From Swiss-Prot:
Catalytic activity: 2-formamido-N(1)-(5-O-phospho-beta-D-ribosyl)acetamidine + ATP = 5-amino-1-(5-phospho-beta-D-ribosyl)imidazole + ADP + phosphate + H(+)
Top EC class, one word: ligase
Natural source organism: Coxiella burnetii (strain RSA 493 / Nine Mile phase I)
GO CC terms of this entry: cytosol
Protein name: Phosphoribosylformylglycinamidine cyclo-ligase
GO molecular function: ATP binding; phosphoribosylamine-glycine ligase activity; phosphoribosylformylglycinamidine cyclo-ligase activity
Length: 352
């Protein structure tokens, strides 16, 4: 009969020795509480640390519709890890979620985060969560909860992943879903801060192939600064527009660029005709195209090309909209217009 291994020869095990430090995680929760408190807004009914975050819907809605969104930051995280700079990646996370939610006409209300890592480094985590808090303040949403998962063996020690979750509310009759878009409508683009949080797998490939150090000077700052510039949060600007402009559709320009994202909010048998000479690409996109020898079609399909949000509205409102955006400190351009198409599937046509 086979004997069982003698476990007495080994020291006793614990969760901590297995790689999960519960006390360190508890310390992090305490560090998060003042960050969350700074984001508090009317409607918050609970603090951080409970089993669920409680939020009361604002009064005054006749038929409130909840709008949810979830997203991550993609491989931009790899640059943050390589550079050991984690202070703005949380802003990216919030931006990717709230910018999606507001395209429906909804006001983003609250946010939750998920932070997973192979080894919990509280200093790193505090930087990330401080950024998330800053993003929530910029978006005027409350940070009401989240999850920290230490998973040794699944992630390498320094690696981590982030996911964000946002919920907003919109009056049912004010939902923006593209159904109001008409042929002849104008398209206005609002400037991005750079690649935002998309295209970084290609960016990292370009950097690796060209053997270019991230410390290299670029546009009066380091290349690292340019590539880690946080994603713009458009919530305050768009909420102001909603109060004064009849916006027919909104497209958040993320992975897939203008080519893939604008058609998501267009009705059948229409196309967005965009004049590529309507704005100047930020220098970072010229640089990436040159260093990677990236075909122009691939650039359009991968990057935002300097446009972070696209508005579709009646041509009669263009001047007022541009003036309002300028007053709000935004850089914006007329990108083109909506035209009819013989194809049922909406599309984008970029004119040279």
């Amino acid at each position: 009969m086979q004997s069982m291994p003698d476990s007495t020869r080994h020291p006793p095990l614990s969760y901590c020795k297995a790689g999960v430090d519960i006390e360190k995680a508890a310390d992090l929760v305490e560090a998060i509480k003042p960050i969350a408190k700074r984001t508090r807004r009317p409607g918050v009914l609970s603090g951080i640390g409970g089993f669920g975050g409680l939020f009361e819907l604002p009064r005054g809605y006749k038929q409130p519709v909840l709008v949810s969104g979830t997203d991550g930051v993609g491989t931009k995280l790899k640059l943050a890890v390589e550079l050991n700079r984690h202070d703005t990646i949380g802003i990216d996370l919030v931006a990717m979620c709230v910018n999606d939610v507001i395209t429906t006409g909804a006001e983003p209300l609250f946010f939750l985060d998920y932070y997973a890592t192979g080894h919990l480094n509280n200093e790193q985590a505090k930087q990330i969560l401080t950024g998330i808090g800053a993003g929530c303040e910029l978006a005027e949403v409350a940070l009401i909860g989240g999850e920290t998962a230490e998973m040794p063996g699944l992630y390498r020690q320094k690696d981590y992943d982030l996911a964000g979750f946002c919920v907003g509310v919109v009056e049912k009759e004010k939902i923006i879903d593209g159904s109001r878009v008409r042929v002849g409508d104008a398209l206005i683009g609002i400037a991005s801060s750079g690649p935002h949080s998309n295209g970084y797998s290609l960016i990292r490939k370009i950097l690796a192939r060209a053997k270019i150090p991230l410390s290299q000077s670029f546009e009066n700052k380091s290349l690292a600064d340019g590539l880690l510039a946080p994603t713009r949060i458009y919530v305050k600007t768009i909420k102001r527009l909603f109060s004064e402009i009849n916006v027919h559709a909104l497209a958040h320009i993320t992975g897939g660029g203008l080519i893939e994202n604008v058609p998501r909010v267009l009705p059948s048998y229409t196309q967005a005709v965009i004049d590529s000479n309507g704005w100047e690409w930020p220098a970072i996109f010229h640089w990436l195209q040159k260093q990677g020898k990236v075909p122009i079609e691939e650039m359009w399909r991968t990057f935002n090309m300097g446009v972070g949000m696209v508005l579709c509205l009646d041509k009669k409102e263009v001047r007022k909209t541009l003036e309002l955006l300028a007053a709000l400190g935004e850089t914006a351009w007329i990108l083109g217009e909506i035209q009819s198409s013989s194809e049922e599937q909406p599309r984008v046509t970029i004119t040279p």
